[in-house]
Design a protein with these regions (language model features):
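Extracellular domains of the immunoglobulin superfamily
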Residues: 1-128
């Protein structure tokens, strides 16, 4: 069954760093254009963090704050994407999700512009 797997939840100290991993099979990864990262703080809606291109490793971020504190990357050989957050604040307490955007297909008419696979989420709690 096609799916994305994520690393486990954890409690982190203020100012610390954390890495969240998102991995899948080689077959799925090679048919993926973008791995998106989004988060959901308690009682809030989804917030888009950014994406990393599965093949090239190019990145794009949703805000300047994310660009300054979050690094998105991928290891193609391991079919894994990473999100590294530094300088954690209590506002970073959230569940973090990775989601796949596959390549568009001109043959099927599939634009590929939606998230068809999601990870189960990684809860990060920032504590003083």
């Amino acid at each position: 069954q096609a799916r994305l797997e994520q690393s486990g939840s954890g409690v982190k100290k203020l100012g610390a760093s954390v890495r969240v991993s998102c991995w899948t099979s080689e077959d799925i990864f090679e048919r993926t254009e973008l791995i998106h990262w989004v988060r959901q703080a308690p009682g809030q809606g989804l917030e888009w963090i950014g994406w990393v291109k599965a093949v090239s490793g190019a990145v794009n971020y949703g805000s300047l704050d994310f660009r300054n504190r979050i690094s998105l990357s991928r290891d193609r050989d391991l079919s894994t994407a990473y999100m590294d957050i530094r300088g954690l604040t209590q506002d970073d307490t959230a569940t973090y999700f990775c989601a796949r955007q596959k390549f568009a297909s001109r043959y099927s008419g599939d634009q590929g512009s939606y998230f068809d696979l999601w990870g189960r989420g990684t809860l990060i709690v920032v504590s003083s």
